[in-house]
Amino acid sequence: ALVIAAHPGFPARDLGALLAAARARPGEIGYATSGNGTSPHAAGEMLWGRAGVRLSHVPYRGSAPALTDVIAGNVPVLIDNIVSALEHIRAGRLVALAAMTG
């Protein structure tokens, strides 16, 4: 399963609010993943396309650097494996917006 999570300073607290923000600011909101062509990247692009919004993909070379940059506030949103992000969500370093399965 994947999770869409955000830095605690990002105003969205659920997927609907993220999509509304993306509609208001097309292409201005970045989302980090573990790299181009990965499952999180593909899932994000499919979701944004179906929702009719545009977010800017920020690819990293693995999950750890993506998590680090979102926690630091350098990128506002992350799509990652829920196992990798769960500890940070529980600690309040990330806010879970939605889970993706299937």
What is the predicted role of each segment?
Residues 1-65:
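Hinge/capping helix and adjacent helix->loop/strand transition within the periplasmic-binding protein
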Residues 33, 59, 81, 99-100:
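Short loop/turn and capping residues at structural boundaries
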Residues 38-40, 65, 76, 95, ...:
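Short, flexible micro-motifs
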Residues 46, 50, 64-74, 83-91:
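Short helices/loops that flank or line small-molecule/ion binding pockets
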